[in-house]
Amino acid sequence: MNNSSELIAVINGFRNSGRFCDINIVINDERINAHKLILSGASEYFSILFSNNFIDSNEYEVNLSHLDYQSVNDLIDYIYGIPLSLTNDNVKYILSTADFLQIGSAITECENYILKNLCSKNCIDFYIYADKYNNKKIESASFNTILQNILRLINDENFKYLTEESMIKILSDDMLNIKNEDFAPLILIKWLESTQQSCTVELLKCLRISLLSPQVIKSLYSHRLVSSIYECITFLNNIAFLDESFPRYHSIELISIGISNSRDKISINCYNHKKNTWEMISSRRYRCSFAVAVLDNIIYMMGGYDQSPYRSSKVIAYNTCTNSWIYDIPELKYPRSNCGGLADDEYIYCIGGIRDQDSSLTSSIDKWKPSKPYWQKYAKMREPKCDMGVAMLNGLIYVIGGIVKGDTCTDALESLSEDGWMKHQRLPIKMSNMSTIVHDGKIYISGGYNNSSVVNVISNLVLSYNPIYDEWTKLSSLNIPRINPALWSAHNKLYVGGGISDDVRTNTSETYDKEKDCWTLDNGHVLPRNYIMYKCEPIKHKYPLEKTQYTNDFLKYLESFIGS
């Protein structure tokens, strides 16, 4: 006898000939010969059954008629060394039987088979199965597959078998793979129609109501399975009082603008949520120290340096919807770098910076409206400055800190409205080169330089400004001090990434936990090596339906955009 496989083959031969068999598994009219010792060694169920006086020691039969005969037979063959022959048709029966008999290796083999073959065609079936038998591993994997393929599944014949509890779980999930929230009510209505079940308020609460278009809200109002329920209409009548909703992960794209290590080109990167990686989607020739503003999903890059030693007045843009560069944009009124960039609903603003002629600081703010042939003067800051933080909040332009005359930082905070400039509570410390973001009605700044005299100290400070109370609050510091990092807000969280730390480009990112007031290094948003991220913008997907007039079959029209 050379090895265990030969021994198993011999024992299986004994079983087939009935030699030394001391137990019969009875399933209805079928019988399976076996050995108690062999079954006990492979199955926890049989081990307990045969050793704890559950049956008489002289008993020769065990009745398992509540189990599927073919599955039990396949598993006993498996115990005796015959490989399982798994298919999509039999794997569920074999797995549930293996789970009952507690045959660990067979359970693992069945689970691995399902996970390997999981797809949009079988994920609902396996999800319902896993939920019934409380298999968390398969339930989680099949649920994620449903989320990823949800718009394919709304016409699947198994879609109607999902329970209301499952639909609430699906429609509530941040990872639901829809690029526009208007598709969530479509998913709900398709399920209601397939089950002929009336809507409930619990289902409506899963929708991000504040993100829905008026056309889709009207479609909900008018649908018979919604309008017939008084509680649902009452809920929809009060949506104006609901809190603002945050977009789902797939309804926005994180687009970063920076300089790559590939000959220092401008690089546009997109975050892949599925792979948890940044992927370069476009690049162009080198430029640095430029300002960035985003309007209508177009990223504008203003001024800065190109490959010459002189500052530039050129403005270029990248259209995230068409994945194309735009070059025919009017130039700035004069070359400048280290300026601030902002946008409101109509205009792009270029703020302050360093002029090319004599490297002097400028206080001018210019604005440009897309389709207009030139930039126009808008205002002047109280003092010339560069490398300041800028933010647009409640229709006001805020200018924060920056470098002023003498290469020193300032702690000034001012806002510009139609009535002119207004001073606000000063920063707790003089700062420049920090990142700035508006989040949840406040202005947040992080990193940069801070010093009262010469600009030379890299900061890890994070501050928030409340415009209602006109006060600054110091938050937990970054783990890594950095200048000119990118600060962005997505899915109700704050992130900071990139920048320069200790004169070296850093590819690290950090996430802020508001409840714990702490920053955590974020392995999921690590940047490409030697990549300076100037700005990161959540870009909301746009669809032509947003300008479409409402009709009675609007949801059917919406469905035609699936896959586009």
UniProtKB/Swiss-Prot annotation:
SMART domains: BACK (SM00875), BTB (SM00225), Kelch (SM00612). Keywords: Early protein, Host cytoplasm, Host-virus interaction, Kelch repeat, Modulation of host E3 ubiquitin ligases by virus, Modulation of host ubiquitin pathway by virus, Repeat, Ubl conjugation pathway. One of its GO terms (biological process) is symbiont-mediated perturbation of host ubiquitin-like protein modification. GO terms for cellular component: host cell cytoplasm. The BTB domain is responsible for the interaction with CUL3 while the Kelch repeat domains supposely serve to recruit the cellular substrates. Interacts (via BTB domain) with host CUL3. This is Kelch repeat and BTB domain-containing protein 1. It comes from Vaccinia virus (strain Copenhagen) (VACV). The gene is KBTB1.
